[in-house]
């Protein structure tokens, strides 16, 4: 049985988010194919996540023990490390993703939990895990220098040791003349297909 962490980062309501229409379809199909797996949904806008402050640094760099697992910040890092698979759903905002997702990544980027420092440099601790990034974008950003969200996520997940990463991108949703409903449906089809083997 696998533990799946479904991270959602969009301030829009469920029915309004084009990203969530695709990611929720992915999750539903995954459940059908993996009924024994545990799926934990983490809607970042419903969590008490903020930008790190000076007082938080002691928690991040302090002792990692049983008591620290209940820490208001470190609990997210432990939860992240405990998962086997990750579904990260976030739209492209200003060539990246919503700032709350970066704030969350700062919460889970903790030495001794998701990576460690060695004499040879940092080493990821989350090996043999997999992730999928589901993103909706207003324009066409495949292989574009303006695309920094998916590129960053792949880099930081790789830093944690996660190498098996897929991306489902629904592009050109804000381009005049594009059939948005059709584009989203294409994204859902891709999501369902990938969920069967994730």
From Swiss-Prot:
Its cofactor is FMN. It catalyses: 2 a quinone + NADH + H(+) = 2 a 1,4-benzosemiquinone + NAD(+); N,N-dimethyl-1,4-phenylenediamine + anthranilate + 2 NAD(+) = 2-(4-dimethylaminophenyl)diazenylbenzoate + 2 NADH + 2 H(+). Binds 1 FMN per subunit. FMN binds at residues 136-139. It holds the Pfam family Flavodoxin_2. Keywords: Flavoprotein, FMN, NAD, Oxidoreductase. Its EC number is 1.6.5.-, 1.7.1.17. GO terms for molecular function: electron transfer activity; FMN binding; oxidoreductase activity, acting on NAD(P)H as acceptor; oxidoreductase activity, acting on NAD(P)H, quinone or similar compound as acceptor. It comes from the Bacteria. Transmembrane segments: none annotated. It is an enzyme of class 1 (oxidoreductase). Homodimer. PANTHER family: FMN-DEPENDENT NADH-AZOREDUCTASE 1, FMN-DEPENDENT NADH:QUINONE OXIDOREDUCTASE. Belongs to the azoreductase type 1 family. This is FMN-dependent NADH:quinone oxidoreductase 2. The gene is azoR2.
